[in-house]
Swiss-Prot record:
It comes from Borrelia turicatae (strain 91E135). One of its GO terms (biological process) is glutaminyl-tRNAGln biosynthesis via transamidation. Signal peptide: none annotated. Belongs to the GatB/GatE family. GatB subfamily. This is Aspartyl/glutamyl-tRNA(Asn/Gln) amidotransferase subunit B.
């Protein structure tokens, strides 16, 4: 039996707009429960929705970024289902006419680039949030602050074949939406949510079968996504061997994922499109978009996306794959690097310094680059001192720590403390001569082939110059003198 894992993802991105999708309530996370509501997002009789123009422009921008075909006619539908946190009894969404279709993005995998096709992107509103505070309480609470929040749902083709690819796809989408400033994509706060559809394509003696699709919900981290996919792959394989159930006979069902046990759990059979009783929303008109408007969104708001940035950074600065992946994880870090690199004769070393010393500080202090107190020019200046042998790498790290503490440039500290590296040959020769005169035993050990004697004498040279001497020059001069002894 041969089989292939098929994974499709439905990603919900909550947009960071100022107001909700169909009313004027503030669109923010948290706050006093039910403090950001109005008759419209509470579903009160007679309240009418009005379309947030920024919802449409954001969807268009997302379409451009994912190489999608963008529709000229926008239609909104009502998706009916009964749940306590859905006060109207329906969700405003898009059914048969999504704003974007037939897109794709590339992901980077261990075997190279892979194209993931996107079936559709559609606009919709979020539901409220049910809160189950205490198991002992025989009740639940509902916070409608989230009700009506603007969402985009991105539905991929089942082109993903393992958990690692799923995480790579989610990471790529998250980067795109963050680069475009459409969302903070914070999974903990629910602004980036994912449902995973998993089944197997089985080949037995040339005959293909598909197992029932499991839609796995409540995945709150990339780690959970990977674990759920890996578990479901094994579960479906075993179920096929035991029961040989196919998608045609069973269809689709909804699963939950137990993080503690690392297993999927059957919740219910999946609703069909007919179960949702979609109808066109009679309160929202059809909207026609001119081609010129669609293109204007691209020309005015599109930025260089992370995949393209990685390619450019490698070509322009000679950076490694690791360097560019780490830098582009945060577009503000890329900006910081490029502002430092433009003033440096060695951009590669600037990148190394940022990815080691600067990121270490950011991680220790749990801050991002926007909160970092040193401007990019300070980093490029310090790197130039290293490149030009004005300071050693060891001294540079000490200078960097003082720069952080005092918020001053490296030049000021070097001048104040006379830390510039000594490269004057005549001065170094005098120090070497002094060390040789003081250590005749070390000279004898060197002549007997004892390499540790050289290390000892170099240590003496560094001590006499307070670590400021150019070590390469000092070692070269020392070796020349020893050969002459």
């Amino acid at each position: 039996m041969e089989y292939k894992l098929l994974v499709g993802l439905e990603v919900h991105v909550q947009l960071g707009l100022k107001t909700k999708a169909f009313c004027g309530c503030k669109n923010d996370f948290g706050g006093i429960p039910n403090s950001r509501t109005c008759p419209t997002c509470l579903g009160l009789p007679g309240a009418l929705p009005s379309i947030n123009k920024e919802l449409i422009s954001s969807a268009i921008l997302a379409g451009h970024a994912t190489n999608s075909k963008i529709k000229n006619i926008i239609k909104f539908d009502r998706k009916h289902y009964a749940y306590p946190d859905l006060p109207k009894g329906y969700q405003i969404s898009q059914n048969d006419a999504p704003i974007c279709e037939n897109g794709f993005i590339f992901i980077e995998t261990c075997s190279g680039l892979k194209k993931i096709n996107i079936i559709r992107i559609h606009m919709e509103e979020d539901s409220g949030k049910s809160l189950h505070l205490l198991e002992s309480e025989n009740r639940s609470y509902i916070d409608f602050n989230r009700s009506g929040a603007p969402l985009l749902e991105i539905v991929s083709n089942p082109d993903i074949n393992n958990g690692e690819e799923a995480v790579a796809y989610l990471s790529a989408l998250r980067e795109i939406f963050r680069y475009l400033d459409l969302s903070d994509c914070n999974m903990e706060n629910g602004s980036f949510r994912c449902d995973v559809n998993v089944n197997l394509l089985i080949n037995e003696n040339g005959v293909e079968y598909k197992t029932p699709i499991s839609e796995i919900k409540n995945l709150n981290s990339f780690k959970s996504v990977k674990l759920a996919i890996d578990y479901e792959k094994s579960r479906q394989k075993e179920e096929w061997i035991l029961h040989r159930r196919t998608f045609e006979s069973v269809g689709k069902h909804t699963m939950g994922f137990d993080d503690k046990k690392g297993i999927t759990v059957l919740q219910r059979s999946k609703e069909t499109v007919a179960d949702y009783r979609y109808i066109k929303d009679p309160d929202l008109p059809l909207i026609k978009l001119d081609d010129s408007y669609i293109e204007s969104i691209k020309s005015n708001r599109m930025v260089e996306l992370p995949f393209d940035t990685r390619v450019r950074l490698k070509e322009q600065y000679g950076l490694s794959d690791f360097d560019v992946v780490t830098l582009t994880a945060d577009k503000n870090l890329v900006k910081y690097f490029e502002e430092a690199a433009i003033a440096s004769s060695d951009p590669k070393r600037v990148a190394n310094w940022i990815l080691s010393e600067v990121l270490s500080v950011l991680n220790d202090r749990e801050m991002n680059i926007l909160d970092f107190n040193l401007p990019p020019s300070y980093i490029s200046e310090l790197v130039e001192f290293i490149v030009n042998d004005r300071v050693s790498g060891k001294i540079a790290k000490e200078i960097f720590l003082e720069m952080l503490e005092r918020n001053v440039s490296s030049a000021i500290i070097i001048n104040e403390k006379n830390l510039a590296q000594i490269s004057d040959i005549s001065f170094i020769e005098s120090v070497v001569f002094e060390v040789l005169n003081e250590n005749p035993k070390s000279i004898e050990l060197y002549k007997k082939g004892k390499s540790h004697a050289i290390k000892f004498m170099m240590g003496q040279i560094m001590r006499k110059t307070s670590g400021r001497v150019n070590p390469v020059l000092a070692n070269e001069i020392l070796m020349n003198k020893l050969r002459d002894v």
